[in-house]
């Protein structure tokens, strides 16, 4: 297949700062790929490459050169994607995978599912970004009023006692049967105090905690996963672990209760499929999360997510992060993300 790819950089602006225990984002740079081919006249396949600064394994000074080279190779290979050659560049792989898929389907409905047909929504968690106590409390109450049954809080920045107070506030009004609570520490705890904090958090009947300690401490993380009364989900731990053998080693060494998959960070669609296969062999649960992509990337992740029969609330965005997002037939109804098939 003859093909051409145009690379279009774009700077997106957050409606409000997105804060974790590590960093606060106010803008977001992404690269859109526009793929065309005379074999598919009138069509353009669009993908999004969106490495996260200071987090993605492919957040590199020469990223644009690497991206341009990958696009040239796809053109030279007649549209045949060499996924193995791009294992170390998951955001580029994800962008190319989804651009190809969009070109071939000719629709934003990238896979044939009940979601893509507008028959079913995907349950999602309501995400509460870092802020001061009053701001976070207000956001929590907004999410609960909107109908979210799973709330995820970013913790590790405003003080552990204040964060416990927020969680207690929710539990004072809603039981664990009514509202599922997840927390994400983004590696904020130290190995020395992590277990004590996990014990205190577990008293509030939380579903899980993502990445309690910094990535790369396999022995300490394995100990927490084995002994913690609160289930542990790996997130940042998966970044840079790009080979099948590496994935097997990590999961066998730590044996977490869950893993959280972000295609832009964890190997694109094909890498995500590898993670899921290895996790399920070990009876490790998983869910899929977007990573501050615009609606182009969010739609691609949601379309892929819908191909699985996973009943857990997913960590997909709402499409409302940016002031200058791309229009996409996505809509949040109560606590589900829907694809509005009538709009395509």
Give residue ranges: language-model regions:
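Short, loop-centered acidic/histidine patches that primarily coordinate divalent metals
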Residues: 10, 36, 50, 264, ...
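Enriched - but not universal
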Residues: 34, 66, 132, 221, ...
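Long, contiguous hydrophobic alpha-helical segments, chiefly transmembrane helices and signal peptides
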Residues: 124, 155, 288, 296, ...
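Catalytic core of soluble alpha/beta enzymes
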Residues: 158-299, 303-305, 322-333
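Short helix/strand-capping turn motifs
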Residues: 309-314, 318-320
């Amino acid at each position: 297949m003859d093909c051409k790819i145009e690379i279009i950089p774009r700077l997106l602006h957050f409606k409000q700062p997105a804060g974790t225990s590590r960093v606060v984002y106010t803008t977001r740079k992404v690269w859109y790929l526009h793929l065309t081919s005379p074999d598919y006249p009138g069509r353009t396949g669009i993908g999004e490459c969106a490495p996260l600064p200071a987090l993605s394994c492919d957040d590199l000074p020469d990223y644009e050169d690497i991206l341009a080279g990958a696009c040239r190779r796809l053109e030279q290979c007649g549209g045949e994607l060499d996924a193995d050659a791009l294992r170390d560049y998951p955001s580029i792989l994800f962008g190319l995978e989804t651009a190809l898929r969009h070109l071939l389907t000719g629709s934003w409905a990238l896979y044939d599912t009940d979601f893509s047909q507008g028959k079913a929504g995907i349950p999602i968690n309501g995400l509460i970004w870092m802020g001061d106590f009053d701001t976070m409390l207000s956001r929590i109450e907004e999410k609960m009023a909107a109908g979210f049954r799973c709330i995820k809080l970013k913790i590790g920045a405003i003080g552990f006692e204040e964060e416990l107070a927020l969680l207690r506030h929710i539990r004072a009004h809603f039981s664990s049967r009514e509202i599922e609570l997840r927390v994400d520490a983004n590696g904020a705890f130290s190995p020395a105090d992590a277990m004590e904090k996990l014990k205190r958090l577990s008293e509030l009947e939380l579903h899980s905690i993502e990445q309690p300690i910094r990535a790369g401490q396999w022995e300490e993380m394995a100990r927490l996963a084995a002994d913690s009364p609160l289930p542990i989900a790996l997130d940042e731990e998966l970044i840079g672990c790009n080979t099948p053998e590496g994935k097997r080693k990590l999961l066998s060494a730590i044996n977490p209760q869950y893993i959280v998959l972000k295609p832009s960070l964890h190997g694109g669609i094909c890498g995500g499929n590898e993670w899921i296969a290895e996790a399920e062999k070990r009876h490790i649960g998983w869910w899929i999360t977007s990573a501050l992509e615009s609606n182009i990337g969010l739609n691609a992740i949601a379309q892929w997510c819908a191909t699985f029969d996973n009943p857990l609330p997913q960590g997909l965005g709402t499409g409302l992060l940016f002031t200058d997002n791309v229009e996409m037939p996505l809509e949040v109804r109560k606590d589900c993300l829907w694809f509005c098939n009538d709009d395509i």
